[in-house]
Amino acid sequence: PVAPIDEQQRIADFLDAKCAAIDALVADIQSQIDTLEQYKRSVITETVTKGLNPDAEMKDSGVQWIGDTPAHWGVIRGKYILRYMQKPVRENDGVITCFRDGEVTLRSNRREDGFTMSDKEIGYQGIDVGDLVVHGMDGFAGAIGISDSRGKASPVLNVLDTDQCKRYIMYY
């Protein structure tokens, strides 16, 4: 349908105003989301390095970026509390991916396209529900989590076991 030119102009003016208002709301909400994500990161960092008791006696951790930690806590390298696991791949398992938001799940749970499949799954390993998984290249960016799925993964994912609380390690 084609409206008269003056009505087209009014429609365009109306839509310009409405879309600008919606865009402003989206920008404001995105700013709030960014602020909340930053706050979430600070709460996690503060809690895993300082604990839950703000009145606890503190000591120097010996690690510059951590600073002081509760006096009754120890500082130990990850290699002493984490063990690499190598599990066999099961036939017909789907591919698991460790995403930067910390989700470790079957790739098909997140998307259907936009990734490549490997013809030869050399070095692939099995992953079970509850496994602690760290992405070998994106772990620093948050690609660490606990698997919610059973499947297989490329060698870039590290499956780890620990006697510590896996959820705590995931946040750390």
Question: Residue ranges of each PLM-predicted region?
Answer:
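Amphipathic alpha-helical segments
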Residues: 1-37, 70-76
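DNA target-recognition domains and sequence-specific DNA-contacting regions of bacterial/archaeal
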Residues: 1-2, 76-172
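Non-catalytic DNA-recognition/assembly elements of restriction-modification systems
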Residues: 5, 9, 60-90
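Residue-level signal for well-ordered alpha-helical scaffold segments within enzymatic catalytic domains
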Residues: 13, 24, 46, 68, ...
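Short, tandemly repeated low-complexity microdomains enriched for cysteine and small residues
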Residues: 37, 56-60
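Heptad-repeat alpha-helical coiled-coil segments used for dimerization/oligomerization
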Residues: 37-43
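Extended intrinsically disordered, low-complexity coil regions enriched in Ser, Thr, Gly, Ala
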Residues: 48-56
